């Protein structure tokens, strides 16, 4: 499993998601949408039933249901991350 996770993250960092400070769109570059769409497809392949991409801002939302018995109270967990990289440094060729 560790190797699968490592390979998945290496695939993500290889996507050039450099942002553009001069842009007035969200996300600031089309390249960032490539990663968003990749994440949506991977989550769906993993069996996550509720996955969507916000077409206006490029946000990816996924709801992973609890595998705990019905009615068992457990804390809610959220993952939040940027999909873009700094406009100051190229995002191309990352390995």
Give a label for each model feature:
Residues 2-95:
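Acidic/His- and Gly-rich active-site-bordering loop/insert found
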